[in-house]
Design a protein with these regions (language model features):
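Conserved thiamine diphosphate
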Residues: 37-97
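General beta-strand structural signal in soluble alpha/beta enzymes
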Residues: 12, 48-50, 78-82, 102-105, ...
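Thiamine diphosphate
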Residues: 1-47, 107-108, 112-236
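Acidic, glycine-rich active-site loops and adjacent beta-strand->loop/helix elements
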Residues: 14-30, 50-55, 84, 107-109, ...
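Short acidic, glycine/serine/threonine-rich loops at helix termini
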Residues: 1, 22-25, 57-63, 89-92, ...
Length: 236
């Protein structure tokens, strides 16, 4: 907070998400609110990198998912890339954004360490490659089909690879539309709702515990906005 107040751009890492709790009070009461409480005099422009998710034998100390807590802090932006190219593009956008940004990075996607995540490793984009915050990516797009069961999967991070691999294994690539959120806040609601209205069904895939989760909140939002277009309840 102090570094940002004097014009610097701090980039901080919490290693790992399980260790974010001691700093949560400062993130909630100072980082996210400083601009508002000072009437714009002391905006906090910073990046907080957080390796996250289950991988290897980390057990209770290196495997948590904390997005359900972080997304309830107003005043910060949150990104969760699914591959190396997106990480670069989103990090550059975060650097130029005047707001505090939390970047959640799944440990299992570093160097594609988990089987089935080869596409997480990508050729480094150009120096000026930037992805706008708040814009989702339709990774696997399908056309509207009247006589075939279709589905929208909304996901991010590791879930993108689970969804893509599963649709291939089930030979349903032309029936399943996959949306990679990229940014959890601000949320690209327009892309989500457009897809769900087209397919009539939706599955929200995340790694986090389901109770009182980001996934349940998103499912409720989709259900509320797309109710008349849905053929079945939104599942998580």
């Amino acid at each position: 907070v102090g570094m940002s107040a004097v014009g610097l751009k701090p980039i901080v890492e919490v290693q790992f998400a399980d260790y974010i709790w001691p700093g949560l009070n400062q993130l909630f009461t100072e980082v996210s609110r400083s601009c508002y409480l000072s009437n714009g005099k002391w905006p906090v422009s910073m990046i907080l990198r957080v390796p996250i998710g289950a991988y290897g034998s980390g057990g209770p100390y290196h495997s948590s998912s904390v997005e359900s807590v972080i997304t309830n802090i107003r005043g910060i932006k949150i990104v969760y890339p699914s591959n190396g190219a997106d990480l670069k593009g989103l990090m550059k956008a975060s650097y130029y954004d005047p707001n505090p940004v939390v970047i959640l990075e799944h440990k299992g996607l570093y160097w594609s360490k988990i089987p089935g995540t080869k596409t997480a490793t990508s050729v480094e984009p150009s120096e000026d490659y930037i992805l706008p915050l708040g814009k989702a990516w339709v990774l696997q797009e399908i056309w509207k089909q009247e006589d075939v069961e279709t589905l929208t999967i909304v996901t991010y991070g590791m879930g993108v690879h689970w969804a893509y691999n599963a649709s291939g294994e089930l030979d349903m690539r032309d029936q399943v539309e996959i949306i990679d959120l990229r940014t959890l806040f601000p949320l690209d609601e327009a892309t989500i709702m457009t897809s769900v209205k087209k397919t009539g069904k939706c599955l929200v895939v995340t790694e986090e515990p389901s109770n009182n989760s980001f996934a349940l909140a998103l499912a409720g939002k989709i259900q509320e906005n797309c109710f008349q277009y849905l053929d079945a309840p939104v599942m998580t």
